[in-house]
């Protein structure tokens, strides 16, 4: 009995370690596949209205995206493989929230701020969709 308990704890630790070590790009890729697979199920209730950001820079609309996901999750029959989709989306949200915590500010020299600003503007100029 004691050996069974030790094996159960060891198995749980291994599963937890594996889950923690999955790279986020793998989770995102898997979630995109699941979303495509379950699209018909997710769109079966056309009376549900979800917030869809009008802005094309998705990184600015994260809050709206996850509010819509919460509504969709509450309107969808639970269980089966669609549950994995929502678990992955939850992992992605937690990852984004952890990354946002890194936005905390720190007092630095003007040169360091300008370096950061230049990098930010470079990303904005190449990765953001600019509206006219």
Curated annotation (Swiss-Prot):
One of its GO terms (cellular component) is extracellular space. Homodimer; disulfide-linked. Interacts with IL5RA. Interacts with CSF2RB. Belongs to the IL-5 family. This is Interleukin-5. It comes from Sigmodon hispidus (Hispid cotton rat). Residues 1-19 form the signal peptide. Gene3D superfamilies: 1.20.1250.10. InterPro entries: 4_helix_cytokine-like_core, IL-5. Its main location: secreted. The gene is IL5. The keyword Chloroplast does not apply. Glycans are attached at residues 45, 74, 88. Homodimeric cytokine expressed predominantly by T-lymphocytes and NK cells that plays an important role in the survival, differentiation, and chemotaxis of eosinophils. Also acts on activated and resting B-cells to induce immunoglobulin production, growth, and differentiation. Mechanistically, exerts its biological effects through a receptor composed of IL5RA subunit and the cytokine receptor common subunit beta/CSF2RB. The keyword Secreted applies. GO terms for biological process: immune response. Keywords: Cytokine, Disulfide bond, Glycoprotein, Growth factor, Secreted, Signal. GO terms for molecular function: cytokine activity; growth factor activity; interleukin-5 receptor binding. It is found in: Secreted.
């Amino acid at each position: 009995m004691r050996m069974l308990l030790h094996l159960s704890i060891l198995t749980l630790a291994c599963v937890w370690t594996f889950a923690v070590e999955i790279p986020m790009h793998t989770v995102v890729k898997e979630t995109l596949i699941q979303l495509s697979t379950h699209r018909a199920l997710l769109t079966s209730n056309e009376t549900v209205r979800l917030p869809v950001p009008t802005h094309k820079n998705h990184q600015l609309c994260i809050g709206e995206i996850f509010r819509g996901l919460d509504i969709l999750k509450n309107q969808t029959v639970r269980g089966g493989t669609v549950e994995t989709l929502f678990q992955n989306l939850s992992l992605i949200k937690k990852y984004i929230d952890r990354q946002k915590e890194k936005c905390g500010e720190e007092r630095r020299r003007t040169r360091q701020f300008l370096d950061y600003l230049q990098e930010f503007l470079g990303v904005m100029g190449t990765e953001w969709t600019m509206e006219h």
